[in-house]
């Protein structure tokens, strides 16, 4: 079988104990990332609702573990199955806090957002330039 050489625009970003790989200019990835925030908010609301009814620490820890898994599944949906967020984040629960009290989930999204925004802007800029070039060539050929 022959191998096709194809540049998919995938870039690598050091994250935790591994490498996160994705194409920051992929509009599909950007859309999924933008859809992630409301889903994360819903997971947080669900976590708060469910934890009110729990009476012991073991149940709360189990709920946190399940919610962490759901959010990591969403990250896999956004960035692809080749990016194992449990491994990348050294099995740290995304709802754990850093020294300033921010959740690991918030830190992760804040770190990724400017990379993806720049990628989306680059994609739009290239599309605009290509459209302008097409229009220029059409005008010249008339």
PLM region spans:
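C-terminal charged interaction modules
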Residues: 77, 82-142
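Short coil/turn segments at secondary-structure boundaries
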Residues: 58-66, 96
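Short N-terminal mixed-charge amphipathic segments
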Residues: 1-61
